[in-house]
């Protein structure tokens, strides 16, 4: 079996299943997510946002696997070319478990999949149990895109609930700075697709005039590396740990990759152009 994964979530899943030997190529974002791939000398192909059919064909795959986010036109071109393609579109944690099992069935790694899923479920259950000791349930705004503002996906809402928070808004829906300001959430979490850990928190707060929000006043504003929340596979457990640390720091240990707002920098921010990533960078979301 020769597989071309078009998103890091697929590659990371194959790695967890110990089936990286099935890869015939990968994207640059897969390589960033799993640097050890560099030793395999795999051909680098474009991802599911900008996929190149002929480029993929040259790797002679038995199967191309794509996942969210993707551009319909790119996947349609692959399908029309006759290349075998499997497209995954998970929304919930249950969907992610199903996708892991599906990938495992393709590469004959069912026992590894069940072990991985059990680990995910156990960690989520443990986090939920610890969060049950909370004295309050803070309202949490999670943002996966900054222009326009877009709420994080449904699986993130589930992670927020497991961490002891109340998810604000409709998962995956657009919103506005005014709507979020009116809701005045207790915690602000930013995890922009394709931005890694580079969301400019102080600039965002200043440009949206959110200084008065209680989350800002209390410094409950954080950036979570996007691969921890936007990659639908087992690595979401890191995102859960970040959310838990941000939502209930008295109950959960700090996370080394959780970046907190520095209020001292707010007054230093000079109004600039929109800092949000370009649409092209969305393809690195997993």
Task: Place the predicted regions along the sequence by residue.
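N-terminal ligand-binding lobe of clamshell/alpha-beta domains
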Residues: 1-286
């Amino acid at each position: 079996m020769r597989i071309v994964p078009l998103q890091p979530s697929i590659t990371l899943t194959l790695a967890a299943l110990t089936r990286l030997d099935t890869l015939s190529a990968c994207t640059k974002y897969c390589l960033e997510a799993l640097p050890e791939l560099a030793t395999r000398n795999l051909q680098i192909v474009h991802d599911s946002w900008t996929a190149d059919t002929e480029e993929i064909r040259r790797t002679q795959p038995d199967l191309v696997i794509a996942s969210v986010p993707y551009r319909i036109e790119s996947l349609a071109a692959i399908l029309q070319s006759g290349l075998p393609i499997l497209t995954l579109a998970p929304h919930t944690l249950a969907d992610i478990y199903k996708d892991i099992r599906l990938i495992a069935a393709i590469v004959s790694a069912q026992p590894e999949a069940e072990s991985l899923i059990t680990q995910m479920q156990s960690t989520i259950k443990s986090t939920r149990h610890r969060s049950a000791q909370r004295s309050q349930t803070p309202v949490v705004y999670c943002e996966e895109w900054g222009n326009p503002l877009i709420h994080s996906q449904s699986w993130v809402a589930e992670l927020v609930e497991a961490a002891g928070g109340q998810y604000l808004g409709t998962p995956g829906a657009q919103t506005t700075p005014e709507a979020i300001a009116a809701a005045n959430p207790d915690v602000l979490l930013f995890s922009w697709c394709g931005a890694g850990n580079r969301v400019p928190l102080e600039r965002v707060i200043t440009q949206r005039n959110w200084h008065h929000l209680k989350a800002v006043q209390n410094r409950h504003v954080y950036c979570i590396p996007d691969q921890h929340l936007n990659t639908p596979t087992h690595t979401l457990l890191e995102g859960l740990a970040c959310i838990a640390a941000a939502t209930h720091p008295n109950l959960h240990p700090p996370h080394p990759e959780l970046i907190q707002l520095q209020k001292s920098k707010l007054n230093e921010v000079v109004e600039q152009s929109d800092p949000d990533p370009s649409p092209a960078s969305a393809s690195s979301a997993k």
